[in-house]
Every structure is written in C-alpha cells, then in structure tokens.
From Swiss-Prot:
GO terms for biological process: DNA-templated transcription. NCBIfam families: rpoC2_cyan (TIGR02388). It catalyses: RNA(n) + a ribonucleoside 5'-triphosphate = RNA(n+1) + diphosphate. DNA-dependent RNA polymerase catalyzes the transcription of DNA into RNA using the four ribonucleoside triphosphates as substrates. It is found in: Plastid. Belongs to the RNA polymerase beta' chain family. RpoC2 subfamily. Its cofactor is Zn(2+). In plastids the minimal PEP RNA polymerase catalytic core is composed of four subunits: alpha, beta, beta', and beta''. When a (nuclear-encoded) sigma factor is associated with the core the holoenzyme is formed, which can initiate transcription. This is DNA-directed RNA polymerase subunit beta''.
Length: 1379
C-alpha cells in the first residue's frame, strides 16, 4: 500500500473536463494497458463517483437558467443596418437579387456564429455552473446548436424546397417567436412527438435494410492476399489529426512503412496507439491500410482486411458475423438522429469567406499588373488575383507585408489609405473545387405595375423568336415605368375616378353629335350604351357590325392629357362593334364623312397593321394599312379565275411582302380583272347521311341531310375526303352536246360575251355575258356540259393616297414613298369557303411602304407608323406619321405606341374641353390628382391591358438657385455639320412631339402647315399659339443638345417628322446633362444642385426644370431570362426576370435520418455542377496521357470505383459526425462495399458468359475476363440498399425481404440455385448458421490460415504492380485491339 501511494505521488494531475469523447479514449487506453477485467473494475468506481457528485450537486433545469446574451441587441441592430444599406443598393439598381440574397445570408450567418461564440464566453464569465452550460458543454445532453437557438437566435431557415429564406428569425426560443417567425420556423423544424413517432419506424426499417444487405458477410479467412489498400496521410490538409488517429487505430498495414532506409512497420501489422504516434512523430509518408473495400473475397471477408475486433484489442475472430454488427452499428443511432434534430432541423449552416485584415494604418501598395477588376459575388467592385500576391502597407514607421492567397478578391484600391483591422481582401480558396453545386432558378417579381423597358443588351432566344422569352447578353438594367395597370372590367362601367382629366366621345349616327361627359360616370355609360349604331346607306355611315370598324388610336399631346373611352370586350357595345377585331390592328378614320359624299368609295375606316413587337416596326415593301372596299365583297361561296380562253392578257404581278419583320414571303396577285363563279358549298361530317345523289339535279329548298336544306337549285357534286364530306351545288344550265361537238377544249374555261353557243335544241345563241363552261363526266360513256354564270369584277385604281389622305403641301422624301395597291386575296381556281352570315372580301386595297434603296439615306430600312392627333379648341385632326428607325433591336428612345380604344368624332362635332389650358396650367397638372390612361396592344385574349399614369408616378426636379442651373451648358461649336437630325423624343405623358420640350401647340406641327394655320384662324387663337421667342433645345441622334434659332431655315418632312437643320450657323451645340428618355438612378449626382430623390425616366426637359416619370430599376446578369415584351404592361407580382446561378449545396439542410437514407439509397441529387463534365474530361485526358490509352482507361475505371466508394463513406460519416455520433469507418465500408460491388454488363462487347444488362459482381467479372482471356465490357453502378438486397446470390433471402411472389416465381423460371451461404437463408430453412461455432463445419481447417504472400503494392511506383497483376488482361486487350 505504501508503494502504491508513492507511485500516486509521482503521477501527473490533469485538471481537464472529462466529456464523453475523452471518456471513450480513456476506456480504450485502459483496455490496452490493463485488459477487460481490470478496466471494468475502474469503470465501476467512476460510475459510483459520478452518482455521488450528481446527488450532491442536485442539478435541475429551469426556465430561468436560459440566460440570453447581453450583446445580442447591438449585434442584431448592426446586422439590420447592413441589410438595410444593401437593400437600398438593390433598390437603386446597383446589385441584383441574387447578390442581395447572398449578402443577406452571409450577414445573418456571421451574426449567428458570433452569437454562438459569445454564448460560451457569457456562460463562463457570468454563471459557469449554469445547468444548461454544464449539460451541453459536457456532452451529456444537447449540443451547442440547440442551446444557441434557446438563448441566442434561430437565424436563417430553409423552406420546404431547401432554399434559404432571406428573412432571419432574430428571436430565440427563450424570448418567444412572433407569428411570422413561427411560420418560417415550421418549414424546416421537426415537431417533437409526432416526428419521433414517425421517424422511429423509419429508423427501424433502415436497420432492417442494412442488415439485409450484409447479413452474409462473415469472417472466413485470415488473409485474402490482396495487394490493394487505401492511402491515408495526415499532412495533406484533408483530414484532421484526431480523425487520422481514429481511422488508423485497429487497422492492418497493407505495405511496409519506411523512413529512409529504415523499416518502422511491416505489412499485415496491427496498428495500435504507439504505432500511430510514431507515424505522427516521424512525419511518415502516406500510409496504405487494408480495408473491407479492397478485400478480394466475394461473399465474405478476411481478418486482416477487417482489422481489430470492436470488443477487444486483437484481430477479429474467425466466424464472427461482422456484417450484422455493421448494420446494427449504423442503424441503431437512427433514433438518436431523429431526436437530436428537434431543434436543429432546417437551420442553415454554411461557411463564410476568410477575411484578410490590415495590420496597421497606412497606404496600400500592390502590383496592378497581377490583378484585374471584377465584381464580387455580393456586387462590390474588387480586384481578382489568381496567384499569391504581396500587398505592402506603408505606415509612418514601418512597412507591413501581407500575403494574399490565390483566388482572392482585393477590396481596396492601389494607394488607398486603410485603417487597422480593415478588411482588405477576402479569400475562398479553402473550398474544395469538387464541391457539389446545384443549379438554382430565382424569379424576380415586379413590386408595382407599369411598363417594361430595357436596353439594347436584350436579344431573342433563337427557339423563341415569336415568344416573350429573351436573354441578356451582358449585365444591364431593366426598368418598370410606374403606372397603375388594370384589366377591363367585365361590365361596361367607367374606370375613371373623380377629378380625372379625361374626355369621352361617342359616335351617334342619327344626331351626329358627341355625347357630353356627365358629372357622374353612370350617366356617361348609359349614353354610350344607348348610342345608335344602325347605319343607313343614304347617310353613308359604315356598318359597324362588319370586321375591323371602330378601333382607333389616340395619342396624348402635351396640352391635353385626355383619354378616349376604354370599352370592355365582353360588353354589349364592345361585342357589337369589335367582336371580330383582329389582333395587332386598329382603324383610323382619316377623312370626315362630308369629304366622301361625292366620291364612289363609301365611307369606311382604314385598318392599320401593327407588328407584334412593341415598337410597331415596319420594313420595306411591307403593308402599312389596308382598306376593304365593299364593292368587292360576297356573301356566298365560290371560286375566282383570272384567265380566259381567248384573252390571256390579264396582268399578273407577284409581290413578296415581308410579314411581321421576318423573311416570310406571302404571294399576293395583282390583276386588272377577275371573275367570281358562285356556288353553294356545305362541309359535312363523314358520318352524315346524305339524302341526294352525286351528279343529280335538285331544286331550291331540297332536303340534303336531316337538318339541312339547299338554298339554290342545281347540280350536286359530292366529294368524300378523309373525315369530311364536301357537297357542292352548281347552279346554271345543263347542255347535252352531240357526238360531233368538240367540247373538250371548252372544259373549265371562261367564254367572253359575243361568242355563239349551241343549246339543246340545236340553236345557236350569242353569249351576252361571261360564262363558265365545265365538262361533267358522271360515267365513262356519258358526259354533259355545265354552263354557269360568272360575276365580272373590274379593279379600278380610283383609290389613291390622295383619296385616303389630305394632299401633302411639302415635298416627300426621295427614298421613301407610299403606294396604294389593289391585291386579290384568293388564288385562281381555288375554292372560297363562306356562309351567308359573314361576308368574303375578294380584293383588298393596301397601302404599301416602299423604299428606294439605291440612294444613300441617313436611316435604315425599318420604319415605325403611328397616328398623330392635333387638337385645337373645337377641331380635331388625325395624321398618319412614319418615323424611320435605325435597327430592329435598338430600343433606346422608343416607346410603346399607346393605343386607345374608342370612337373618333368628326371635325364638326362638339369637344368636351371648352377651355384650353394655359402654359401655367400645364405644369400644375403634375401636382394634382389627375391622370392619363395609356392602353397597349391587346396581347391577352381575355382582357385589355391599360395603364393609368397619374401625378403620383411623376417627379419634378426644380432648380435650386433659380434659372442659373439650367439643364444644358452652352459651348462653342467647333465642327460644322451640314445637316443635324433631331430624333423623336418622348413627351411628358406619352405623346411623341418632335420637339424636345414644347409648351404650346405651336410646335406640334403636322405635315399640312396651311391646315394648322387655318385651324388657328378659325379659333381666333391669340398669343399662346403665335411664334415664341423662347429658347428651345433639341436632341440629336448622337444625344447632343442643340439650341435652335427660329430665324434659320427649317424644313419639316412629311412622313419622317424629323427636324433637319439646313444651316449649321443657326444652332449652337451644347453638352447635355439630362436628355429626354434618359433613365436616372436615385441619388446619382447629375448636376451641381442635388441628386434626384427617386429613380425614373426623363419625360420632359425644360430650361429650368425636369419632369421624371418614376421607375423601378432591376439589375440583371448575363444569361438571365427576361419575361414579356418591350413596353408591355406588368402588374404587381408578375415575373420580370429569372436568374440562373450556381450555389453550393449547403451542409445539412436535410438533417439526420433522411440524409443518411438519401445517401444509402443512392438517390440522385437535384442537379450537379454545370462544369463537372469538363473536369472529368480533363482528368481522363491527363491519366491517358501519362499511362497510355489502354492502361489509362483501365486504371481510370479502377480509380473511379475506388474514389466513389471513399466519397460515399465520407458522406455518411459527415452526417453522423454532425449529430455527434461516432461510428467506425469499417462498418460503413462494409455497407458501401455491398452497394458498389455490382457492375452492369454493357452491349459493347457481347460475351458468351453474361447477357447484356445483367448485374454481376465486380470481382466475378474480373476473374471471368482473365479466365476467358478476353475483356468483358461493363460499367459500374451504384445500387441502393433496397436494390442490393434484391440482387444477392440467395433467392430465399431476397424473398423473405420483400416482393416474395415475384422473387420466387422469377427464381423458379430461371432455375436458380441457393447455396445457403448466408445466415438468413439457413435460419429460414432451419439449418446450422454458418457463423460462430457453426463456421467450423463449413470451412476446411487447412484453408483457414492459408495466406497468399504478395510483395506487390498498388499505389506505389505509379501503380506498376497493378499492371503486373493484370498482365494477362492487358495482353489480351492489346492483342484484340486493332493495330
């Protein structure tokens, strides 16, 4: 006893906390030194000591023991401030949504992690004996993550799809959650008892599947003789030292270990604690160890590959069922995983960037040649360095050198002054390059309604030429110009509110007056609905029930921001007038009714064709408008013909028309005379019962089918086609010619008037009008001739551009003209289908836009058509206007044509605005509760889109110091320009005035100046409409601002409406600060006064102020998908843009058991890295280049299987270690070996042994290939544990697992033999279990200790031993390969 006391005095006292992990190490070392019996005695004493201390301490847990962190308040406040700053950047359009999401996640994750660290310090300093602190710190109950959520903050959560929610839960469970935080928390959190009950059954089922896979794995041999192994090294940075020790202890070396010439460990040596310490001390090379993954046994395992037994320190005994032990070891912690994920489910865990901070104050010096500017993943400007970079910080006394790692972002500029501890760089080089990434799509929704505008960086996807899917070629802004979009209501009610600036015109046929706008909207609606639309011929009023009648366009000018009535398609008024309105068309009555009284052409509207895109782009030789003359209209079916028997001089001309801006040619015939042959046509279903026969004669009102009667009498022709029956009735005369009559040449031809023809009574008569002669042959021997009347149409060219439009007093453009062409719409001899309810148009008068391409022009071939309305007191005039544009994709300065739906009044009608607004009232409109309605092309079939632009959507920038701060700065002009072209600009509320800022109607000139002057004389307009002597600034196409001198020569073009300055001396060029149509971001300094308070588009530029239409910018990255068309109306919540980006799959969003099951069942991930294919190709080329083509392929396949197995083991271990569960790698390796041991025979090489598609063992395939001396083509597959359980060598084991009937019937048909090698099949049949004591009768004792000494090494010397080992296989491969 005294000696023992003396020894205790010499012992070292360790004052450390003994947690669960330390206890495990202590017990393991006690077993190594003292054995099992003495260790159990020591553990009993430790247990007694623990019970005594716990009883004396009397630890209890209460709600007051949950101490919150004092610094949480200002930490959360600081994070909120950073998030608010970044939210402002996003609002300004400086960063896009993905960058904002990344920054928000990292801000809150860093805050949460800092709170976690503060939690430990707070407990140690304030209450070190706190029960919560004792429990989680000792590892007895809970972990740091759970306690952090109790007393810190829950942080970021994931939604059910695994995506991060950028709104963090700032509260902890001690403080309580708000309603929003509770709903977010419920997305990913487990729900206690319910979750435990469900997951417990899942854990049991997982254990059953695991045991089913490996139940036949028993130790049956001492050494399998393999030369393979897994290389483990503690110095490659991939494995911590503690994990390295746990991996090596209990293993067996696969090769000798040398340090220089000295051998410190031999092959097949058991690795203990002492040997591991020697490896660490001597810094040995990578160590090759034997694992179950490399064991050569097919249905069992050897002692050396398994290693030390988990119960004692020696090698595992023969006959031990290590497979069942492995399944139990992995499945048993399943219940613990379920319970442990109660508080951690759904909480985001990730990594942040490593920051490099400045050691002191000073000036930064770096080599700018080694870096290039870029943009960080958070949207900050930075410099990227791909190699190591040394940064020098020059302080007053000393120079500090900071080493920046490669692939880092430098956040400071050269020669910039930095403060101590300021972040100068961030590095993400520590992340693995082979991290799994998933492709994520993030949709950005519109915050408010408005119009979509974009820059020239948007182009159509090739497969979506006519769709609304666009891609971005480079980073640019998308703008939503604010408005209040709304759909037309289902009832014909007014959408205007009180005090809205508007005017309503409705066309009354009988009274020919405009209904006045009443004070209430209901009265106005009643007057509109009661308008008389029953037109009479004597009044020469158009029939509004026809196609394309009463749709009009209204442009809103600067002086009168007024609108026309917007009518709903479903209302009775709208359905009568516009029931058959075609898409992308609108009609403008350009002439009044009185002007057409003395002309042959009846009053009708002209249908304007607008392309489907928002800008209304027309191309050369395209139809701009068309007019349907009622003289060429028929109500019955028939066919048209152009040629005659004797007259073949009919002029034929083919024009190819560009349709909708693409090279789609449609042939239209231009003729002088054509003939229409009427007939009655009925299209019947194939199953109809016809009551008349083919080639029979019927009368009027004859019963054709059960519910159909004929309208005319004549010859019946019945033709049966696929699923329909076409029945025609030809009316005319039947003529039976004699045998000598030569009638064949007159078959199906036209006979002009004056030609003699014979009748059935042998008499000759002269034809008075054109007739159609057609030979009918009902049988081979009989025939007769059908003579039908023909309607002749002479196409008169009486409709010209002068007829449709007022005469042009100014000269036209030399290289552009409008031609009126009559086109026949139907081909010769082709049938025209119609009925008696609707009419058929035979000829269409088209207004074709022609270009003379021989002469040089300042413009490209594209043009844009619109209609301008000029209003003065009581007179309204509409003009067709064509603007030439540069390119179809150049949308800068272009706006969607605002189309109004309603009826236009005549010139003599009363106008609701009796008091014109003065110049002062114009500017006041922006500050009152008044608005203007914009309507757009009806792309939605269900409802009409429109946008209300009110004063709340505009912002006015007044000068800070009076007139001193103008928007333009005068400069002296140095160069001479013969002609300065002034491009069209956007007006304040949607109009298109040709002058940049026009405050009066004097500058809204049309192409008919005399007509405008007459208007002014009629209205006795006084000074507001006289010539002003104010300064006006024009914007040229090069975005230069020019000051116009009214005394200079000014030429105004007819169809162009561009201003051309003929003399350069008459204007002074200035530099622009704000240009019309320019988009301005919020708080961006433009002049010296002050930055704009809101983002928007400049819609009015004046000398002393600027009006901005508010807009919301969205920054989009290359590859993003833009939804919708340019100028399209968006509603709040509509998808504007979709981002496609990659993100790393977060560590454990799916916690616990589901994650383990996902890996073990080998379920595919949602998506992999987009550049993974390139990595694999590069890796394969590298191996092939080093080892040659045949060897490279073989070794590449081998390494792929080995690396995949190791990766699976690491994945499973990662999940368990995250939950604090430690499982030895050997158990997981046995499971992974079984699910990766099968290969699929491919069809490339047909073998006589295996059939294509058969699953066989990997080792069996290799041995068969060596025995047959021919390669077997196969590919490795990963089977899940369920599928692996149904693909074993025992059909009895498979049938007892699941699908019993299928497995047994398939085994009976295939004649399978069960060799009863596993444990389960012997239990089922009542045999001796081949494990434990039953193992001795199964294996010959002489073979138990038979070893195969091999001095080969797989992973040393460039894998030469592998090639030697498979020399026969390689020789056969080389012999069979083509030379």
């Amino acid at each position: 006893m005294e000696v023992l006391m003396a020894e205790r005095i010499n012992l070292v006292f360790h004052n450390k906390v003994l947690d669960r992990t330390a206890m495990k190490r202590l017990i393991s070392r006690l077993i190594d030194h003292f054995g099992m019996a003495y260790t159990s005695h020591i553990l009993d004493q430790v247990k007694t000591l623990g019970f005594q201390q716990a009883t004396a301490t009397s630890i209890s847990l209460g709600i007051d023991d949950l101490l919150t962190i004092p610094s949480k308040g200002w930490l959360v406040q600081d994070a909120e401030q950073q998030s608010f700053i970044f939210e402002k950047y996003h609002h300004y359009g400086n960063v896009h949504a993905v960058e904002k999401l990344r920054q928000s996640i990292e801000i809150w994750y860093a805050t949460s992690e800092y709170l976690r660290q503060e939690m430990n310090l707070n407990f140690r300093m304030t209450d070190p004996l706190n029960p919560v602190h004792l429990m989680y710190f000792s590892g007895a109950r809970g972990n740091a993550s759970q306690v952090h959520q109790l007393v810190g903050m829950r942080g970021l959560m994931s939604d059910p799809q695994g995506q991060m929610i950028d709104l963090p839960i700032q509260s902890n469970l001690r403080e309580g959650l708000s309603l929003t935080e509770y709903i977010i928390s419920c997305y990913g959190a487990r729900k206690g008892v319910v979750d435990t009950a469900v997951r417990t059954s899942d854990a049991g089922y997982l254990t059953r599947r695991l045991v089913e896979v490996v139940q036949h794995i028993v130790v049956r041999r001492t050494d399998c003789g393999t030369a393979r192994g897994i290389s483990v090294s503690p110095h490659n940075g991939m494995m911590p030292e503690r994990m390295f020790i746990q991996t090596l202890i209990g293993r067996v070396l696969a090769d000798d270990i040398y340090i220089g010439p000295r051998c410190i460990a031999t092959r097949n040596q058991n690795i203990g604690v002492g040997l591991v310490n020697r490896f660490l001390n001597f810094r040995a090379e990578p160590i090759l160890i034997r694992t179950p993954l490399t064991c050569r046994s097919t249905s069992w395992i050897c002692r050396l590959c398994y290693g030390r037994s988990p119960t004692h320190g020696d090698l595992v005994e023969l006959g031990e069922a290590v497979g069942i032990i492995a399944g139990q070891s992995i499945g048993e912690p399943g219940t613990q995983l379920t319970l442990r994920t109660f508080h951690t489910g759904g909480v985001f865990t990730g990594g942040t960037a490593e920051h490099v901070r400045a050691p002191s104050n000073g000036k930064i010096r770096l080599n700018e040649d080694l870096v290039h500017p870029t943009r960080t993943r958070h949207g900050y400007p930075a410099f990227f360095c791909s190699i190591y970079l040394y940064v020098t910080i020059e302080s007053q006394d000393i120079l500090h050198h900071v080493k920046i790692p490669p692939k880092s972002f430098i956040l400071v500029q050269n020669d910039q002054y930095v403060e101590s501890e300021q972040v100068i760089a961030e590095s993400r080089a520590g992340t693995s390059t082979f991290n799994y990434k998933e492709k994520v799509r993030k949709h950005i929704y519109s915050d408010s309604g408005g119009e979509m505008h974009w820059s020239t960086n948007v182009y159509h996807a090739p497969e979506f030429t006519y769709g609304n899917v666009h891609l971005l070629s480079k980073t640019s802004h998308l703008w939503i110009l604010l408005g209040e979009p709304c759909h037309s209501s289902l009832v014909s009610t007014s959408i205007h509110r009180d005090q809205d600036q508007m005017s309503v015109q409705s066309l009354s046929v009988k009274r020919r007056s405009t209904s006045k706008l009443s004070e209430t909207n209901d009265e106005a609606n009643q007057e509109i609905a009661s308008a008389d639309f029953s037109g009479k011929k004597e009044d020469r009023i158009a029939d509004f029930s026809d196609v394309n009648r009463s749709i009009c366009t209204d442009h809103y000018n600067l002086v009168y921001p007024a609108i026309l009535p917007i009518l709903d398609e479903n209302s009775s008024f709208f359905s009568n007038c516009l029931s058959k309105r075609r898409r992308n068309q609108f009609i403008i009555p350009l002439q009044s009714i009185q002007e057409h009284k003395n002309e042959l052409m009846p009053c009708s509207s002209i249908s304007m064709k607008t392309p489907p895109n928002a800008n209304g782009i027309f191309w050369a030789n395209s139809i701009l408008a068309y007019f349907d003359d009622p003289r060429y209209r028929r109500n019955n079916s028939g066919s048209t013909k152009y040629g005659t028997l004797e007259m073949h001089s009919t002029v034929k001309k083919e024009d190819f028309i560009k349709y909708r801006g693409v090279n789609e040619f449609r042939q239209k015939m231009k003729v002088e005379r054509f003939f229409f042959i009427p007939e009655e046509v009925h299209i019947l279903p194939g199953s109809s019962s016809i009551m008349v026969r083919n080639h029979s004669l019927i009368g009027v009102d004859t019963q054709i089918t059960l519910n159909l009667r004929s309208r005319v009498g004549g010859l019946v022709r019945v033709e049966r086609k696929k699923k329909i029956i076409e029945l025609k009735i030809f009316f005319g005369d039947i003529y039976f010619p004699g045998g000598a009559d030569n009638i064949s040449q007159h078959s199906g031809v036209l006979i002009p008037p004056g030609t003699e023809r014979k009748t059935n009574y042998k008499e000759s008569k002269k034809v008075k009008s054109w007739i159609d002669v057609q030979r009918i042959t009902p049988s081979k021997k009989k025939f007769f001739v059908l003579v039908r009347p023909v309607v002749t149409y002479e196409i008169m060219d009486d409709i010209t551009s002068a007829t449709l439009f007022p005469p042009d007093l100014l000269q036209q453009r030399d290289n552009a003209q409008l031609r009126v062409v009559n086109y026949i719409l139907h081909g010769t001899g082709k049938p025209i289908r119609g009925n008696y309810d609707t009419s058929i148009q035979l000829v269409r008068t088209c207004l074709v836009f022609k270009r003379n391409q021989d002469k040089k022009s300042y413009y490209s071939e594209a043009a844009r058509a619109s209609v301008v309305e000029i209003r003065t007191n009581y007179l309204i005039r509409h003009f067709l206007r064509i603007d030439f544009v540069k390119a179809p994709i150049s949308y800068i300065g272009k706006r969607n044509d605002p189309l109004g739906l309603g009826l236009l009044a005549d010139n003599g009608l009363d106008w609701t605005h009796k008091n014109p607004y003065s110049e002062a009232r114009i500017h006041q409109n922006l500050n009152q509760n008044q608005g203007t309605i914009h309507t757009f092309l009806n792309r939605n079939k269900e409802s009409q889109s429109l946008s209300i632009l009110s004063s709340s959507n505009c912002s006015r920038m007044d000068p800070a110091n009076g007139a001193k701060s103008n928007n333009v700065i005068q400069e002296s002009k140095k160069e001479e320009y013969p002609i300065l072209k002034i491009s069209n600009s956007l007006g304040p509320l949607g109009t298109y005035p040709p002058i940049a800022n026009c405050d009066s109607l004097n500058h809204l000139l049309t192409h008919n100046q005399i007509l405008v002057t007459n208007y002014f004389k009629l209205d006795n307009v006084k000074p507001p409409f006289q010539v002003f002597k104010l300064k006006y600034y024009f914007i040229a196409e090069n975005w230069k601002v020019c000051n116009y001198n009214p005394g200079s020569n000014l030429r105004l073009n007819v169809f162009d409406f561009h201003w051309n300055f003929l003399h350069h001396n008459s204007c002074a060029e200035t530099s622009k600060i704000m240009s019309l149509g320019q988009f301005i971001c919020q708080n961006v300094c433009i002049d010296k006064t002050r930055p704009p308070r809101k983002s928007g588009q400049v819609i009015l530029v004046q000398v002393d102020s600027v009006v901005i239409r508010l807009a919301k910018p969205y920054l989009a990255t290359p590859g993003a998908t833009v939804h919708g068309l340019y100028g399209e109306t968006f509603f709040g919540g509509d998808t504007v843009v979709t981002f496609n980006y990659e993100k790393s799959i977060s560590g454990d969003i799916t916690q616990g058991l589901p994650k383990v099951e996902q890996v073990l069942e080998v379920r595919s991930v949602d998506s992999i890295s987009m550049n993974l294919e390139g990595r694999v190709e590069g890796w394969s080329k590298c191996i092939t280049g080093i080892l040659g083509i045949p060897w490279g392929f073989f070794i590449g396949a081998e390494l792929t299987i080995v690396q995949s197995r190791i990766s699976l083991v690491n994945k499973i271990q990662k999940v368990y270690r995250a939950q604090g569960v430690h499982i030895h790698n050997r158990h997981i390796e046995i499971i992974v070996r079984q699910i990766t041991s099968k290969v699929l025979v491919s069809e490339d090489g047909m073998s006589n042994v295996f059939s294509p598609g058969e699953l066989i063992g990997l080792l069996r395939a290799e041995r068969t290939g060596r025995a047959l001396e021919e390669p077997i083509h196969y590919r490795s597959v990963f089977l899940g544990i369920t599928k692996a359980s149904l693909n074993t060598q025992s059909f009895i084991s498979e049938a007892s697992f699941q699908e019993t009937a299928r497995v047994l019937s398939k085994a009976a048909l295939g004649g399978r033999i069960d060799w009863l090698k596993g444990l389960k099949e012997n239990v089922v049949l009542g045999g001796v279990i081949p494990a434990g004591t039953g193992f001795r009768g199964l294996v010959d004792p002489s073979k138990q200790y038979k070893t195969i000494p091999l001095k080969t090494n797989l992973f040393e010397g460039g894998m030469r031993d592998l090639l030697v080992h498979h020399r026969k296989l390689f020789d056969s491969f080389l012999n069979t390969s083509p030379s």
